[in-house]
Amino acid sequence: MPRTISLAVVPGDGIGPEVVHEALRVLREAVPADVSLDTTQYPFGAGHFLETGQILTDSDLAALAQHDAILLGAVGGDPRDARLAGGIIERGLLLKLRFAFDHYINLRPTALLPGVASPLAAPGQVDFVVVREGTEGPYAGNGGVLRRGTEHEIATEVSVNTAHGVERTVRFAFELAEKRDRKRVTLVHKTNVLTFAGSLWQRTVDRVAAEHPDVTVDYLHVDATMIFLVTDPSRFDVIVSDNLFGDIITDLAAAISGGIGLAASGNVNPTGAFPSMFEPVHGSAPDIAGQQKADPTAAILSVALLLDHLGLSEAAARVSAAVSDDLAARATGDAAPRSTAEVGDAILRALSTNH
C-alpha cells in the first residue's frame, strides 16, 4: 500500500547541513518504491538563535509534532561566543524537544564493523545497544542555587526517577533483547551508593525479567561497566541505564567502536504519540564547516535507525549493509581522505549495487 513519510529536517549548524545532505540522498535511495518522502526543512540551531533571538517556540513545536520523524544534523556555534554560553542551544532545543515529545528512550547501537580500527588491542565481537532513559534523572532540571557567588553557595541537582519512567525504559530494553540473538540485558547503575534510585531500578528489572524467561539478566556498577567496556566489550548485548550513566556509557562505547564520527542515535517515543528524532552523535564542528571534511557516516546510520523505527526494517538493513561495505572498502582501498560528498557517493553506490 502506498505510504508517505513526513520528515522534519533540521540541518543545524556547522557540518550539520553537509552530513544531512548526504543522509537524505541515501534515505531517498533506500525507501521502497511504494514509499514517498515528504521533507520540510527547519532552520533551528545556534545560527537561527543569533539571527532571531529565538531557539524553539511553541508554534515550532506544534509544527514539528505533525511529522512522522525528525532528522537532525548537529547544533552549536563557536564555543567562544558568550551569547551561546551555558549550553543555551542544547537546553533550549535538544532537551526541550526531548521533554516536549517525551523521548524517553535514547537508543545508541554500538558495533565494531569490519575495517574499522578500535583503540582496543583485542576488542572481540562488539555488538551491543545502550538503552538510556531520556527524560528523567539529573537532567530533569530539578535543582537550584542558594547564595550564588559567596563562600556559602549551595548548588543542588536532584536525580528524578519515577516508577513509570523506569518501568517503560526497562520494558523497552527487554523487548529489544528478545529480538536479538544473545537475549541479554545488563542493568548499569550504582546501587551500593545511590540506594533509593538504584533500588527502584533493580526492583523494576527483577519484576520485568520474570516476564521474559528467555532473557539473561545481570547487573554491573557503572564504574565496573567502564572497565569492561575497555577490557571485554563483547560481554554486552543490551545495556539499560538511567539518563546520566547512559550518557557517559554511550560516549565510551562510541570511542571503542570507531569514534563518534560513526555513532548514530535515536531519541525515541516508542508509542508514536510524538515524532522521534534521529541524529549523529558528533557535534557541529564549526572549525571545518563548509570544507567537505566531515564524515557523513554517522548521519547515514541515523537514517538506518529512522527507517527501522518507522517499520521499514529491510530498508534499514540495506543502509547498514551499504555502510559496512564502504567501511570495509576504506580499510583495503586508497587511504587518501575523501570529501563528505565522496563518502556519500560511495555508500550510495554500495546501496544501489549490492543491496
UniProtKB/Swiss-Prot annotation:
Substrate binds at residues 98, 108, 132, 223. This is 3-isopropylmalate dehydrogenase. It comes from the Bacteria. NCBIfam families: PRK03437.1. GO terms for cellular component: cytoplasm. SUPFAM superfamilies: Isocitrate/Isopropylmalate dehydrogenase-like. Its cofactor is Mg(2+); Mn(2+). Its EC number is 1.1.1.85. NAD(+) binds at residues 283-295. Catalyzes the oxidation of 3-carboxy-2-hydroxy-4-methylpentanoate (3-isopropylmalate) to 3-carboxy-4-methyl-2-oxopentanoate. The product decarboxylates to 4-methyl-2 oxopentanoate. Homodimer. It is found in: Cytoplasm. It catalyses: (2R,3S)-3-isopropylmalate + NAD(+) = 4-methyl-2-oxopentanoate + CO2 + NADH. One of its GO terms (biological process) is L-leucine biosynthetic process. Keywords: Amino-acid biosynthesis, Branched-chain amino acid biosynthesis, Cytoplasm, Leucine biosynthesis, Magnesium, Manganese, Metal-binding, NAD, Oxidoreductase. The record marks 139, 190 as: Important for catalysis. Belongs to the isocitrate and isopropylmalate dehydrogenases family. LeuB type 2 subfamily. Pfam families: Iso_dh. Pathway: Amino-acid biosynthesis; L-leucine biosynthesis; L-leucine from 3-methyl-2-oxobutanoate: step 3/4. GO terms for molecular function: 3-isopropylmalate dehydrogenase activity; magnesium ion binding; NAD binding. Its main location: cytoplasm. The keyword Membrane does not apply. The gene is leuB. Mg(2+) binds at residues 223, 247, 251. It is an enzyme of class 1 (oxidoreductase). Binds 1 Mg(2+) or Mn(2+) ion per subunit. It comes from Clavibacter sepedonicus.
